[in-house]
């Protein structure tokens, strides 16, 4: 179920949001990070992810995130290759508007997916979540602005 902006605002003000984040690893064990355009976490590098919509099964949520954020998809028969990294909580002082009028609370299921298990989507999607992507590994510059919540994932990989 898709919520209009006012309904979503009411949910964010009054309850935690269930979400999924995707740690996508290439064959060199580097993780895909995107520089966030939207609040919260704007301007930080973060993994692809998004909220779970009411009535949306996990497979379809992951598929939607993959298609809309990186233009990839996973076949249903390959879904069993995805592994759960863990369940995390994210607390932000601001919200998707970028103001401090109300905070955000996310309960996040974090999954690990190997790039080789994905295929390029036939439909080109315009990404409105990230404006730059990198393949990151621990040896890269400390000057990258990686979000602390994302660093928690990196520590568990």
List the model feature ranges, each with a label.
Residues 16, 58, 146, 150:
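Hydrophobic (often cysteine-bearing) scaffold residues that line and stabilize catalytic clefts
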Residues 1-21, 25-27, 100-103:
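Acidic, metal-coordinating catalytic segment for phosphate/diphosphate chemistry
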Residues 30-73:
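Conserved Nudix-box catalytic region and its N-terminal flanking loop in Nudix hydrolases
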Residues 52, 88, 115, 138-141:
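Hydrophobic pocket-lining residues within nucleotide cofactor-binding pockets
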Residues 110-112, 121-155:
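NUDIX/MutT-family hydrolases
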Residues 72-119:
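Active-site segment of metal-dependent pyrophosphate-handling enzymes
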